[in-house]
Each structure stands twice: as C-alpha cells, then as structure tokens.
UniProtKB/Swiss-Prot annotation:
Stretch forming the signal peptide: 1-21
Protein source organism: Cercopithecus erythrogaster
Major localization class: secreted
Location of this chain's protein in the cell: Secreted; Membrane
Presence of keyword Amino-acid biosynthesis: no
Protein name as annotated: Beta-defensin 1
GO terms, biological process: calcium-mediated signaling; defense response to Gram-negative bacterium; defense response to Gram-positive bacterium; innate immune response in mucosa; positive regulation of flagellated sperm motility involved in capacitation
Keyword Secreted: yes
Keywords for the protein's UniProt record, in alphabetical order: Antibiotic, Antimicrobial, Defensin, Disulfide bond, Membrane, Secreted, Signal
Prosequence residues removed at maturation: 22-32
Length: 68
C-alpha cells in the first residue's frame, strides 16, 4: 500500500512539472527564444539595441529584445 502512494506521489510531481510547459517542451526539442537568439549570433538585451544592430526577435518570453 505504501508503494502505491509513493508511485502516485511521483506521478503527481511529474505531471506538475509537465504542466508548466516550458521545461517539458524544451526537453522535447523546442528551444527557448533566448537559445535561438544566441545561437544565431544575437544577444538578448532589456534595453535598446546598440548602434548598428537591429532587433531580430525577442528573448525571455518577449520581455527582452534579440539584437543582431
């Protein structure tokens, strides 16, 4: 009986982690916007992009700009 409670508790923890979506999707190959920006040669900035760079996208779920 104690084993079944332990398995149920583990399942609940696993499902609660999957409910957030971010970590679960990243683990399945969906990359975050920060990763895509840096991988393409950009940098994530909360302030305005420096001179001679353009906004190429967003970072941190749209809270910052990807400058390249």
């Amino acid at each position: 009986m104690r084993t079944s409670y332990l398995l149920l508790f583990t399942l609940c923890l696993l499902l609660s982690e999957m409910a957030s979506g971010d970590n679960f999707l990243t683990g399945l190959g969906h990359r975050s916007d920060h990763y895509i920006c840096v991988r393409s040669g950009g940098q994530c900035l909360y302030s305005a992009c420096p001179i001679y760079t353009k906004i190429q996208g967003t970072c941190y779920h749209g809270k910052a700009k990807c400058c390249k």
